[in-house]
């Protein structure tokens, strides 16, 4: 049995069709069907029920699918381990982050990592925490950066920093000279907030409801860069991590009293899985970068 057989089996199981699976795999349907028959013969059981218009996994197929998926993950990890070089002269690293981190944290971190290890190929994606956790468990990512708590027990969360939400305004805003702003002032502020699909917005809404706050949300945006540009050009304000303001000219982060929301940023990785030298180096640099972010916030 070859890894090709496993890969073909999982593709047919996922697509529910030999035709669609063959197209996704870029092989002919007869060749795919032949490989599946060889696999079934080697296992001694039919894996697919072909009696109807659509194909379905048999009971044996359902059971074997779990093991096949894990086997393919382990084979992939083994291949990466073989090519892993301890001196970090080459290798690859697959990273995903939730959106707020692209505005202040991940840029400097990736730049520093590339400067130190130019032979490492980096793949960076921005996505929801739910998707990050799912892809980590499927071994389609090496590391993720998101927030505690973690929802899947297969994952390990390493604390990086505590992120505070602040009132972010332009330098010309009337409140820019304030050292802090009372939470009750949010009733009077006209806000630009991230749209509902962002975890940050969900957390803000939940906290405001719990605290009896009813801020005036006059603009919603599905892009952090759009929010920041609107803040720069208007007298509106927003609620975002305080560290974002330190990375963008013309903005001021004003602490809220009492604090609106604090959350712990974490680096996520799969438990008990092979950690490449690149992944270990990335964790080390992330912790260094977080220490610098903490120092900047305290100034």
Curated annotation (Swiss-Prot):
GO CC annotation terms, alphabetical: cytosol
UniProt KW Repressor keyword: yes
Main location: cytoplasm
Residue ranges of every copy of the HTH lysR-type domain listed in the record: 1-58
Keyword Cytoplasm belongs to the record: yes
Protein location: Cytoplasm
PANTHER family (UniProt xref): HTH-TYPE TRANSCRIPTIONAL REGULATOR YBHD (PTHR30419), NITROGEN ASSIMILATION TRANSCRIPTIONAL ACTIVATOR-RELATED (PTHR30419:SF8)
Designated name of the protein: HTH-type transcriptional regulator CynR
């Amino acid at each position: 049995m070859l890894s090709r057989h496993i890969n073909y089996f999982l593709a047919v199981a996922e697509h529910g069709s030999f035709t669609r699976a063959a197209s996704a795999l870029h092989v002919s349907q007869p060749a795919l069907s032949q490989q599946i028959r060889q696999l079934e013969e080697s296992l001694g059981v039919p894996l697919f029920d072909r009696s109807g218009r659509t194909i379905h996994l048999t009971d044996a197929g359902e059971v074997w699918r779990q093991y096949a998926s894990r086997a393919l993950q382990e084979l992939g990890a083994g291949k990466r381990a073989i090519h892993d070089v301890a001196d970090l002269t080459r290798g690859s690293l697959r990273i995903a982050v939730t959106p707020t981190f692209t505005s202040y944290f991940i840029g400097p971190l990736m730049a520093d990592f590339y400067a130190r290890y130019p032979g490492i190929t980096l793949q960076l994606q921005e996505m929801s925490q739910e998707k990050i956790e799912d892809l980590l468990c499927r071994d389609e990512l090496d590391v993720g950066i998101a927030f505690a708590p973690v929802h899947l027990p297969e994952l390990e969360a390493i604390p990086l920093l505590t992120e505070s939400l602040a009132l972010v305004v332009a330098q010309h805003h009337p409140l820019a000279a304030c050292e802090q702003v009372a939470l009750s002032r949010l009733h009077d502020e006209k806000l630009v907030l991230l749209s509902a699909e962002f975890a940050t917005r969900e957390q803000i809404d939940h906290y405001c409801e719990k605290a009896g706050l009813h801020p005036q949300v006059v603009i919603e945006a599905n892009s952090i860069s759009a929010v920041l540009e609107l803040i720069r050009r208007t007298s509106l304000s927003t609620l975002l991590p305080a560290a974002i303001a330190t990375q963008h000219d013309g903005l001021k982060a004003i602490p809220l009293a009492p604090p609106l929301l604090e959350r712990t940023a974490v680096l996520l990785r799969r438990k008990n899985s092979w950690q490449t030298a690149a992944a270990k180096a990335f964790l080390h640099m992330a912790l260094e970068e977080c220490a610098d972010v903490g120092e900047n916030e305290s100034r």
